[in-house]
């Protein structure tokens, strides 16, 4: 399943994305019929995928989940640095594809501008190709899967499951406080928007956490406290693993 005849994708998008794209990539909603542009995009990705495999060893895959403001992105950077992981973000990969100006990127941008959802298959293909082109033996996938539809698509397309799922468990009031601390705009509007994001996260992402908990793959990290305190727990966990 781990084909190498694919175009290289940037693991970390280095150009400055627009604030609109960074903050308004739509959340996945299950059972939404894909538009015509999505169908064309699926065909483009499928037609350019390599066929067959070369027997490459599957990397150690860790999903990193947590609500907005839980600090998972910050912790991922430190995990990647200290333990030799490639750090992949689905949002960054979509933005990177858009920034190329190629046909696939333009189609993704049009879907987002229309307020529609980029199909799970597209996001998974970007992740799969990034894993293959990185040649990394250990991969962190940050903030994905965001819903059960994402999870099912990942397992179907890659033919594998994650080896580990890290869930940064953070109380809602703490996440709200952190997110408000990042913003300088109208506080009332920010609170309303943040609480909506948290409700969407709970309804879509928690079932994924529950599923992998039933598979014995989830390690919960208490995401309250300082960055150093949280990383202390993270470091202890990763130091105990055998890759």
From Swiss-Prot:
Its EC number is 2.7.4.14. Its cofactor is Mg(2+). Pfam families: ADK. It catalyses: UMP + ATP = UDP + ADP; CMP + ATP = CDP + ADP; dCMP + ATP = dCDP + ADP. ATP binds at residues 69-74, 182. InterPro entries: Adenylat/UMP-CMP_kin, Adenylat_kinase_CS, P-loop_NTPase, UMP_CMP_kinase. Residues 181-189 are annotated as: LID. Consists of three domains, a large central CORE domain and two small peripheral domains, NMPbind and LID, which undergo movements during catalysis. The LID domain closes over the site of phosphoryl transfer upon ATP binding. Assembling and dissambling the active center during each catalytic cycle provides an effective means to prevent ATP hydrolysis. PANTHER family: NUCLEOTIDE KINASE. This is UMP-CMP kinase 2. It comes from Oryza sativa subsp. japonica (Rice).
């Amino acid at each position: 399943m781990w084909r190498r005849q694919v175009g290289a994708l940037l693991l970390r998008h280095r150009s400055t994305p627009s604030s609109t794209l960074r903050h308004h990539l739509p959340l996945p909603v299950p059972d939404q019929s894909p538009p015509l542009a999505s169908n064309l995009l699926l065909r483009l990705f499928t037609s350019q995928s390599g066929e067959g495999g070369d027997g490459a060893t599957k990397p150690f895959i860790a999903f990193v989940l947590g609500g907005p403001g839980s600090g998972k992105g910050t912790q991922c950077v430190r995990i990647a640095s200290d333990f030799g992981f490639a750090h992949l973000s689905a949002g960054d990969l979509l933005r990177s594809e858009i920034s190329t100006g190629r046909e696939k990127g333009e189609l993704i941008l049009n879907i987002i501008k229309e307020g529609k959802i980029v199909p799970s298959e597209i996001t998974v293909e970007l992740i799969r190709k990034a894993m293959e082109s990185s040649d990394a033996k250990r991969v962190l996938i940050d903030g994905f899967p965001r819903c059960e539809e994402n999870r099912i698509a990942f397992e179907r397309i890659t033919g594998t499951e994650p080896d580990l799922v890290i869930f940064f468990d953070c109380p809602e009031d703490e996440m709200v406080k952190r997110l408000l601390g990042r913003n300088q705009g109208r506080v009332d509007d920010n609170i309303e928007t943040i609480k909506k994001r948290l409700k969407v996260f709970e309804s879509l992402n928690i079932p994924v956490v529950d599923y992998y908990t039933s598979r014995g793959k989830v390690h919960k990290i208490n995401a309250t406290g300082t960055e150093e305190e949280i990383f202390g727990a993270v470091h202890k966990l990763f130091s105990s693993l055998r890759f």
